[in-house]
Design a protein with these regions (language model features):
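Conserved phosphate-binding catalytic cores of ATP/NTP-utilizing and phosphoryl-transfer enzymes
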Residues: 88-112
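Glycine-rich phosphate-binding loop of actin/hexokinase-like ATP-binding domains
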Residues: 107-157
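Short beta-strand-loop/turn "lid" adjacent to the catalytic site in phosphate-handling enzymes
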Residues: 49-91, 103-104, 183-187
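Acidic-glycine-rich active-site phosphate/pyrophosphate-binding loop
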Residues: 15, 75, 118-131, 246-255
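Glycine-rich beta-strand-to-loop/alpha-helix junction loops that act as flexible
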Residues: 62-69, 114-117, 233-243
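ATP-binding/phosphotransfer module of carbohydrate and carboxylate kinases, centering on a glycine-rich
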Residues: 1-58, 103-108, 153-278
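Glycine/charged-rich beta-loop-alpha catalytic/anionic-binding loops adjacent to active sites
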Residues: 81-83, 128-136, 253-260
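Short, acidic/small-residue loops that bind anionic groups at enzyme active sites
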Residues: 86-95, 140, 261-264
């Protein structure tokens, strides 16, 4: 049995390969910088129940996750998953390498992620060969769901959002200013909370103000292409939840920034299954 996981900060998509059988399930996200040992244990038990793995031992686990850019983070993932799911071997890599393998296979390319967070790299066909430093949802994550959510919430609280949208935003999120601040600075997973606000942008994306917000955040993302020098002329393959919500807007911002887009998919899991079946 082989188990493949694509884990963002919000959700994890699992696929169990057992002979010709292919079983899928979705659990909570397992970013080792945001989720603790208890969350990993809970997800492990859910996973065993949903995939019928109680008492079983998985031969190989391939885990691609947000927050898995350092060896210490990867070690935590191996250790914490191993406490509830026995395995013979486990390979933990970043979600960015997962996006690369899913879209490029063994070919070179530029690859990006636009989901709860964001990232971008040059992939040489074997590894992530060039990548900007990922500074997380407070300092970075340009173009991501939490970037859009952060912009909306700031405009709402500072009364810069148009009145009609502000009223609708309040209907959807009837919180006081203090409650919003509490969600960001005191409660767990503030990045998920901010990213959840991007659904409001998706519901009202025909609005001129909302178009400006989406395009502004997307342009900030594509401005990062200049870091990659000659590689920036390659098509950029994009993976992530924002692809389904803002595909047209992302395409327009890319064209306006002189960026050629390649494959655009919401989830890399099917590409990863194909990669590991080869």
């Amino acid at each position: 049995m082989r188990l493949i996981a694509d884990s963002g900060s919000t959700k994890t998509h699992w696929v169990l390969l057992n002979g010709e059988q292919e079983l899928h399930c979705v659990t909570e996200g397992l970013n080792p910088w945001m989720a603790d040992r208890g969350v990993f244990a809970l997800v492990g038990r859910q996973l065993c129940g949903q995939l019928g793995l109680e008492g079983a031992r998985v031969e190989q686990v391939f885990f691609y996750g947000a927050g898995c850019g350092t060896e210490s983070a990867c070690q935590r993932v191996r250790e914490w998953i191993g406490e509830t799911l026995p395995f013979d071997s486990m390979e933990v890599n970043s979600d960015l390498l997962g996006a690369c393998r899913a879209t490029c296979g063994s070919r070179e390319g530029m690859v990006g992620i636009l989901g709860t967070g964001s990232n971008m790299c040059y992939y040489n066909g074997q590894r992530v060969a060039l990548q900007r430093v990922s500074t997380g949802f407070i300092l970075g994550d340009e173009g991501s769901g939490n970037h859009i959510g952060k912009r909306l919430l700031k405009d709402y609280l500072e009364e810069r959002m148009p009145e009609d949208l502000r009223a609708m935003f309040h209907d959807d999120y009837p919180y006081t200013t203090a409650e919003f601040i509490d969600c960001i600075y005191r409660r767990p997973f503030p990045n998920r909370f901010l990213a959840s606000l991007a659904s409001f942008a998706a519901s009202h994306k025909e609005n001129q103000y909302m178009q400006e917000v989406i395009h502004s955040c997307s342009r900030a993302y594509f401005e990062q292409m200049t870091y990659f020098g000659e590689h920036a002329s390659l098509p950029l393959h994009v993976v992530g939840g924002l692809v389904s919500s803002f595909e047209a807007e992302i395409g327009e911002a890319a064209a306006g920034s002189g960026v050629r887009l390649g494959v655009m998919v919401q989830s890399p899991i099917e590409g990863l299954v194909s990669f590991h079946k080869e």
